[in-house]
Amino acid sequence: MSVIPPKFFKIANISIGCIDIIAALSQLTYIFTNLNVFLLAVYGLALSVPIVYLEFKVPSNLYRYASFYFSFLGRGLSYILLSLIISFGGIYNILAGMFTFILGVAFIVFHFSQFVEEPANFRAPGSSLSIGDDDIDDDDDMI
């Protein structure tokens, strides 16, 4: 019973990832003038490249080591962190940071909403149940 189609999340994640990669690449030019902004760009790239990559292929080990990419709350918080990281520089970086921040807040709202179903790439590989499923037979029978 999802109000938002799953295609929206794929488009949103790819667009945020691409916008943030471009913003982080533009911050890499500060290597000689401001080392702090350059280091933030490196962290921005490290956080934004997996966002785009996860929309096409989900590595099996990534769910174990970076599970925040597989929930609305984790992704929302990482988008907010990423927006703060990439917002240094020109007007493009500020706009990209604002857009990423707004989408991060939206993902946090989606986490607490009952009407939004998580996308297929948020589920752990090999598991048929996801977080929030009530299909578990919980009889509390002791053997």
Swiss-Prot record:
<feature type="transmembrane region" description="Helical">
    <location>
        <begin position="90"/>
        <end position="110"/>
    </location>
</feature>
<dbReference type="GO" id="GO:0016192">
    <property type="term" value="P:vesicle-mediated transport"/>
</dbReference>
<comment type="function">
    <text>Golgi membrane protein involved in vesicular trafficking.</text>
</comment>
<keyword id="KW-1133">Transmembrane helix</keyword>
<dbReference type="GO" id="GO:0000139">
    <property type="term" value="C:Golgi membrane"/>
</dbReference>
<feature type="transmembrane region" description="Helical">
    <location>
        <begin position="36"/>
        <end position="56"/>
    </location>
</feature>
<dbReference type="GO" id="GO:0042802">
    <property type="term" value="F:identical protein binding"/>
</dbReference>
<keyword id="KW-0333">Golgi apparatus</keyword>
<feature type="transmembrane region" description="Helical">
    <location>
        <begin position="68"/>
        <end position="88"/>
    </location>
</feature>
<feature type="transmembrane region" description="Helical">
    <location>
        <begin position="11"/>
        <end position="31"/>
    </location>
</feature>
<keyword id="KW-0472">Membrane</keyword>
<feature type="topological domain" description="Lumenal">
    <location>
        <begin position="32"/>
        <end position="35"/>
    </location>
</feature>
<feature type="topological domain" description="Cytoplasmic">
    <location>
        <begin position="57"/>
        <end position="67"/>
    </location>
</feature>
<comment type="similarity">
    <text>Belongs to the TVP15 family.</text>
</comment>
<dbReference type="InterPro" id="IPR013714">
    <property type="entry name" value="Golgi_TVP15"/>
</dbReference>
<feature type="topological domain" description="Lumenal">
    <location>
        <position position="89"/>
    </location>
</feature>
<protein>
    <recommendedName>
        <fullName>Golgi apparatus membrane protein TVP15</fullName>
    </recommendedName>
</protein>
<keyword id="KW-0812">Transmembrane</keyword>
<feature type="topological domain" description="Cytoplasmic">
    <location>
        <begin position="1"/>
        <end position="10"/>
    </location>
</feature>
<dbReference type="Pfam" id="PF08507">
    <property type="entry name" value="COPI_assoc"/>
</dbReference>
<comment type="subunit">
    <text>Interacts with TVP18.</text>
</comment>
<feature type="topological domain" description="Cytoplasmic">
    <location>
        <begin position="111"/>
        <end position="143"/>
    </location>
</feature>
